[in-house]
């Protein structure tokens, strides 16, 4: 088991009130989650399990890497022997499972890898957590499991109808997680969130990709017409949602984490062009857009109801204009936090950026 950080200065397992395992903690959303937990819960030991895939960066965690209540372990959730040993040695109380392959474009050409990591890896993890009798297991899923809809809003009881390999793998993993509640009453909670944006996100996803392309004087590559719309939620807001679920979420339940803010991909590109290239001219903005072939499937909308988590007291707080400006500034200074980040800027990658 490879351990990094200040492991030698940590107390025994019982010196902390809780021991929280966060998988995929060097990735985008999970790194924000870890920073929040480490800073706000000094009596909790936060253990980051990450295999450091191409989209991960420990630079996301530099502000807390030397904290006494933080520990990094490099490892793979698909390694069942390793995962079982981790639960035995680290005495985990709570699991926040973020680790996954998430790039939709890549899922079309590497579907088996997505199935292996997202489905098998999740099964390994929830099985080990159940055997270790952890207090709570939160599985981080996606609104994409619902499939697309032009008008009907999805609630937590809506059927899963995924339309791409990534979404299918997340839906399948949900079934394994939920089965542990149904069969054993193992305290699992599932979340499904809208598109999240903000610092720390590897620039293969639409917002950091468009920002990075424009900051490198390259055009925004838009799949198809760009009329597909997405709901965008700022990273700190989704962290607050996970904290709410951690504290108040009921075992066996599913919680949508959404926002009413919705924007088409084309409008997103134009707004970023306005902010980064400082132009309001439609003709000039078109010069910074390049239309490329669409994905094999590309859902038009993911409208989602979030009243259930609102009932727990959570609502998004960060306005779009504030969040996007913070995000633009962060990428101006931190684009090279990942190795070979430039390879993420291609319109339709068919190989992982590290190849």
From Swiss-Prot:
<feature type="active site" description="Proton acceptor">
    <location>
        <position position="166"/>
    </location>
</feature>
<feature type="active site" description="Proton donor">
    <location>
        <position position="143"/>
    </location>
</feature>
<dbReference type="GO" id="GO:0009225">
    <property type="term" value="P:nucleotide-sugar metabolic process"/>
</dbReference>
<dbReference type="Pfam" id="PF16363">
    <property type="entry name" value="GDP_Man_Dehyd"/>
</dbReference>
<protein>
    <recommendedName>
        <fullName>dTDP-D-glucose 4,6-dehydratase</fullName>
        <ecNumber>4.2.1.46</ecNumber>
    </recommendedName>
</protein>
<dbReference type="GO" id="GO:0008460">
    <property type="term" value="F:dTDP-glucose 4,6-dehydratase activity"/>
</dbReference>
<comment type="similarity">
    <text>Belongs to the NAD(P)-dependent epimerase/dehydratase family. dTDP-glucose dehydratase subfamily.</text>
</comment>
<dbReference type="InterPro" id="IPR005888">
    <property type="entry name" value="dTDP_Gluc_deHydtase"/>
</dbReference>
<feature type="active site" description="Proton acceptor">
    <location>
        <position position="144"/>
    </location>
</feature>
<dbReference type="InterPro" id="IPR016040">
    <property type="entry name" value="NAD(P)-bd_dom"/>
</dbReference>
<dbReference type="InterPro" id="IPR036291">
    <property type="entry name" value="NAD(P)-bd_dom_sf"/>
</dbReference>
<keyword id="KW-0520">NAD</keyword>
<keyword id="KW-0456">Lyase</keyword>
<feature type="binding site">
    <location>
        <position position="142"/>
    </location>
    <ligand>
        <name>substrate</name>
    </ligand>
</feature>
